[in-house]
Amino acid sequence: MSVKPEHYDVIVKPIITEKATLVSDANAYVFEVAKDSSKPAIKQAVEALFNVKVKAVNTTITKGKTKRFRGRPGVRSDVKKAYVTLEAGNSIDVSTGL
């Protein structure tokens, strides 16, 4: 599959946290994705950008928290995360750039 410019708009960045590292043992990787992206679009983007076969895509939307900034309340943006499970034998090195 060839890489298209819109694939770079779907995947914002990889998420590297303790929880994301734990699920990577099960051949799953976590990415922050655009809010309007669908599961088929996420699957196509990951397969094209990283040259792997995707088994499943699960998504969650984390609501933004209310935080104080300079004494005034503000709201952080909502974040959509995609948990991408790969077929056996495939892997992604998220430490390297696209």
Curated annotation (Swiss-Prot):
Q: Which GO terms describe its biological process?
A: translation
InterPro entries per the UniProt record, alphabetical: Nucleotide-bd_a/b_plait_sf, Ribosomal_uL23-like, Ribosomal_uL23/eL15/eS24_sf
**Annotated TM spans:** none
A GO molecular function assigned to this protein is: rRNA binding
Q: What family does this belong to?
A: Belongs to the universal ribosomal protein uL23 family.
Gene Ontology cellular-component terms listed: ribonucleoprotein complex; ribosome
Q: What job does the chain carry out?
A: One of the early assembly proteins it binds 23S rRNA. One of the proteins that surrounds the polypeptide exit tunnel on the outside of the ribosome. Forms the main docking site for trigger factor binding to the ribosome.
What Pfam families does the record point to?
Answer: Ribosomal_L23
* Protein name from the UniProt record: Large ribosomal subunit protein uL23
Quote the subunit structure annotation: Part of the 50S ribosomal subunit. Contacts protein L29, and trigger factor when it is bound to the ribosome.
Superkingdom: Bacteria
Question: What keywords appear on the UniProt entry?
Answer: Ribonucleoprotein, Ribosomal protein, RNA-binding, rRNA-binding
